[in-house]
């Protein structure tokens, strides 16, 4: 049975000594928090932390899936055992996003990077223009791919703004008759996030790889959303696509079979062998989300981010890199007074079992990625460490 773990640690009582100095969080502390063994707090941007409850369930079923005598990795994707997993994964996503029959749920290999090409290949017709918002590195990658396919208009550009931010909705200069409008809901490198999605006449398309199912939103506002699984949904290797069915009719005739959304719709994402184990874990993760409850998960995500931002805002030693209005709840980015101090911060945190805090290689600094499954205890550990580090080095 997948269990909930929503315990928190009072930062005022949390001591750095609780973490030890072995590079893992001690078993005694982890057991107190409801975990079975010593583990690290994984602040990595992705592949990212998974719920321990899910890992335990997968471990239990790894050799013998539901009494079948085989691992789910060994089962045929046409068999009844995997069919039940596939159906649950789709059903869970539908429930979490409250998806109507006007939309289809697809699982596609190639991650979100494949979607950078598939979206324009399927939705951008000859002579049409696709509108893109350049909000940072990941939006830039989507734009680069779309330009290989057809006409692209950049309708807002905050990609190089310092401090980092998203554009305001009123600043979007949408092209009349645009095939679609593409946004990136959360920029993991920049640490910025859309808080209110724009309303557009053209179908709104969003790369939600790093904040999918972290907060409530109306799926009916979008023509298509996509997300690589490895941050909030499961392991790498599969992308979730949710799209309005009528948009699949736009696809030009010469798009290759495996790049057509119609192929995945007609074959229930089973045209070829899908990443069965990745979809199995996705089914477990979304089951965990349903048990916890989307609203409770959202409140916990906001609370986790608020704790770290409060530590940043109360300090002259640390400096956040994103405009407050657009701060990400998933990826918290900040700087220290010098790169040397940042290197020491990362090294010392790692010794205490806090891994993955190094900022992206293109921008440096510190990045704490606290996706859905990241425990509150890890946030409180980081805050306690930040205060201790400032005392010693400020």
Each PLM stretch: what is its role?
Residues 70-115, 122, 137, 145:
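Conserved N-terminal alpha-helix of the aminotransferase class I/II PLP-enzyme fold
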Residues 32-40, 351, 364-394:
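PLP-dependent enzyme catalytic core of the Aspartate aminotransferase-like
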């Amino acid at each position: 049975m997948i269990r909930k773990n929503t315990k928190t640690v009072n930062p005022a009582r949390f001591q750095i000594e609780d973490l030890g100095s072995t590079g893992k969080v001690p078993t005694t502390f982890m057991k107190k928090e409801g975990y079975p063994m010593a583990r690290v707090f994984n602040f990595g941007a992705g592949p990212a932390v998974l719920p321990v409850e899910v890992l335990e369930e997968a471990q239990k079923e790894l050799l013998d899936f539901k009494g079948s005598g085989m691992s789910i990795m060994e089962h045929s994707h046409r068999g009844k055992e995997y069919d039940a997993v596939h159906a649950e994964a789709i059903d869970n996503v539908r429930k979490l996003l409250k998806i109507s029959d006007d939309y289809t749920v697809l699982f596609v290999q190639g991650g979100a990077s494949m979607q950078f090409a598939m979206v324009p290949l399927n939705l951008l017709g000859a002579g049409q223009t696709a509108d893109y918002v350049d909000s940072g590195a990941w939006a830039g990658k989507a734009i680069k791919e779309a330009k290989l396919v057809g006409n692209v208009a950049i309708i807002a550009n905050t990609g190089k703004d310092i401090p980092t931010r998203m554009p305001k909705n009123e600043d979007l200069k949408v092209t009349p008759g645009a095939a679609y409008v593409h946004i990136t809901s959360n920029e993991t490198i920049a640490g910025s996030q859309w808080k209110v999605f724009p309303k557009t006449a053209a179908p709104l398309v969003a790369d939600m790889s790093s904040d999918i199912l972290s907060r409530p939103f109306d799926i009916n506002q979008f023509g298509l959303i996509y997300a690589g699984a490895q941050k909030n949904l499961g392991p790498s290797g599969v992308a979730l696509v949710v799209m309005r069915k009528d948009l699949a009719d736009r696809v030009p005739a010469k798009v290759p079979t495996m790049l057509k959304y119609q192929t995945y719709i007609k074959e229930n994402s089973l045209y070829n062998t899908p990443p069965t184990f990745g979809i199995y874990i996705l089914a477990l993760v979304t089951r965990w989300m349903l048990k916890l409850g989307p609203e409770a998960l959202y409140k916990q995500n906001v609370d986790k981010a608020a704790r770290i931002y409060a530590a940043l805002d109360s300090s002259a030693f640390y400096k956040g890199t994103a405009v407050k209005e657009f701060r990400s709840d998933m990826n918290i980015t900040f700087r220290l007074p010098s790169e040397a101090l940042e290197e020491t911060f990362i090294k010392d945190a790692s010794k205490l079992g806090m891994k993955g805090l190094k900022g992206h290689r293109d921008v440096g600094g510190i990045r704490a990625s606290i996706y859905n499954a990241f425990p509150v205890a890890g946030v409180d550990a980081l805050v306690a460490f930040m205060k201790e580090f400032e005392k010693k080095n400020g």
